[in-house]
Amino acid sequence: MKKITILLLLIVNISLLGYPNQTTYDIVLLDGIIVDGTGKPAKEGALGILDGKMYLLPANTSAESDRIINVSGLVIAPGFVDVHNHTDRSLINPNSNLNEGFIRQGVTTIVGGPDGYLSPVGIQKLKDSLAEHGAGTNVACYIGHNSIRSEVMKNDFKRDATENELNQMRTMVKKGMEMGAVGLSTGLMYTPGSYGNKEEVIALAKEVEPYGGIYDSHVRNPVHDLIGSDREVIEIATSANIGGKIGHLKAVGLQNIGKIRAVIGLVDSARAAGHNIVSDQYPYDGAATTILARIFIIPKEIIQSETLNIEDKVENQFVIILKNLLKDQVIREKIKTVSENGENGGFAWLKATGYTSMRITHSQDFPELVGVYLSQLAEEMNKEPFDAISELLIKANNPVYITLGAIKEQDVQDLMVQSWNMIASDGAYALPGNQGGHPRSTGTFPRVLGHYVRELQILSLEEAIRKMTSMPAKFIGLNTRGQIADGFPADIVVFDPATIIDKSTFVQPNLFSIGVIHVIVNGELVLFEKKITGKKPGKFLKKESFESYKYGE
């Protein structure tokens, strides 16, 4: 490629402005629209990348590089930082560590271990894998309450921890922070964390305070006690004197429609009192998705008598046997009891979210039912809810898909515009062609930029990008990520603001988004002209700062 000569005057200006006094960059992004991640207005400019660092260049730069990429009309933004992401489980496998589904969204850093599921042992495995094999994205992580509680209390977890057990957990939290974790995460809706009381979590949260860590929570009872559960997050964080984040905040279920305004009031009050409370959100009106058969729990004695593999609920064998069992009213009652209450008090989706929170998202046999809540289905059929879903399952020849947590679109929008609310996916590793999963795993960030910024215009481009970049990065202490600034690591996304959009749906959740053109991680192109390069420059990112940040004013 023909090199462009730098004028002597430009060389002088470069040295004065703080970017390298040299003649050749590794990459130059030319004539783009720079949105720097801070919320400041977009401006025309160029970006030079050298030795993994970025440097702002004038819009009419003559900077020299062997790789000059013209990005006229495209947005140059910091790579997106996904603060609630589950792909860490896949990134330790060299066969699944490209993380293409997130690269194609513009994500350059994921924060793994949310919902309480990463122990010091897990963190070490993650660090070792990244050091040896790399990844398509950078990875930071939380230290997880569920994992350490499980390691300390084993199967005897349905009780309060003893002082000795609590001390063991404290030690593990400190170890996780010393390994570079950004804070403590909990999944208080799930076992064994659900058996830990507020005082236990406060004690553990206090251990991250000396490290400048934060508290991130999948709240305890988001459907049946939305306000109380979100208030608990605030109480834990403020008691530990650390920042607190309500993970994937939403108002799920018919009974909670409109209550997001009350939660917004709680957060606003806490912030007005000087507490660093924030939230993250994915831009969809439904939470986790599954097939209807998955919410049924068959009692163990019946499983044993049927020699049924309960671990593989998508197999035809399971559905066929389940349908036959439900035709027997005596057995149906037994299945109802454990499905609605959990076996021996354990977890059950019908107990956690309930019929008023589950909505049908796809049915090949009964398309007219799409959008209907299971509680509404029961009313229409004039049956008890469990009988209604049993009859639907029996009659359907093809899988019926549901969301386990339906959300009203107005509540999604009311939360999205709050200055302290971040964008995050809650997504997992996406495999094209796989029917399972949720569209958030391939569509979260482009959906915000395409649907909520370009189409609905409820957010400005600059504000949306702030919510995806500098705000999450600063909150968790990755202070040189999430912002375009001289000398910062070159994590960059280049996208077309006119075309970026998600393509995945609840029916086809693993379709890749469009509109992201180039992605750079630590100075290396992982996506070039919409094509995956195969490079894996991602690394483990330790918390950089011990300061406490309050964003969103």
Question: Residue ranges of each PLM-predicted region?
Answer:
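Divalent-metal coordination cores built from histidine and acidic residues
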Residues: 71-76, 80-87, 93-186, 205-212, ...
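C-terminal cap of metal-dependent C-N hydrolases
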Residues: 341, 414-420, 425-426, 493-539
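Sec-dependent N-terminal signal peptides
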Residues: 4-13
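Histidine-rich, glycine-flanked metal-binding segment
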Residues: 21-27, 34-79
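Active-site neighborhoods of metal-dependent hydrolases
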Residues: 142-143, 151, 155-163, 169-190, ...
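Divalent metal-coordination and catalytic microenvironments
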Residues: 32, 47, 52, 73, ...
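Acidic, glycine-enriched loop/beta-strand segments at the rims
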Residues: 34-46, 400-406, 410-412, 456-465, ...
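Divalent metal-binding pocket/active-site signature
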Residues: 175-233
